[in-house]
Amino acid sequence: MKLILTADVENLGVAGDIVEVKDGYGRNLLLPRGLAIVATRGAEKQIEGIKRAQEAREIRDLDHAREVKAQLEALEGVSVAVRTSEKGKLFGSVKAEDVAAAVKKAGGPNLDKRSIELPKSLVKATGAYKVNVKLHSDIAATVNFEVVAA
């Protein structure tokens, strides 16, 4: 089945890509969730126009992403305050939205929680951590933050 992606799909492609997928994957997952549309000649022409406009925007976005990266890497004193037990273990874990709020509170830019890549092992103890923030397809920044007891 030939589809045009309307959103970025991990391990498949980015919005605007024309992809060939198995019928069941397209019919049962991509189409119902609005992640893709069926590829027709009219849709392909429309996507070409959208891609041209997107390329112009991407150049501006790339410059903005570089500025945000510089801000994030110069940022210090990012701390997430959470409730902990007497032994220093957290009640729950630190989520991407907690990190985004801490960056904003420390004077950094607004971050989308989906762009923050937390470590595979969840943050469940106090201490210093690093996370990657994907700002653009080509640019990622590293943010250092500390989890402290509230």
Swiss-Prot record:
Pfam families: Ribosomal_L9_C (PF03948), Ribosomal_L9_N (PF01281)
BP-aspect Gene Ontology terms: translation
An example Gene Ontology molecular-function term: structural constituent of ribosome
UniProt keyword list: Ribonucleoprotein, Ribosomal protein, RNA-binding, rRNA-binding
Domain of life the protein comes from: Bacteria
Gene3D superfamilies hit by this protein: Ribosomal protein L9, C-terminal domain, Ribosomal protein L9, N-terminal domain
GO CC annotation, single: ribonucleoprotein complex
Entry similarity comment: Belongs to the bacterial ribosomal protein bL9 family.
NCBIfam families found in the cross-reference section: L9 (TIGR00158)
Biological function: Binds to the 23S rRNA.
Protein name: Large ribosomal subunit protein bL9
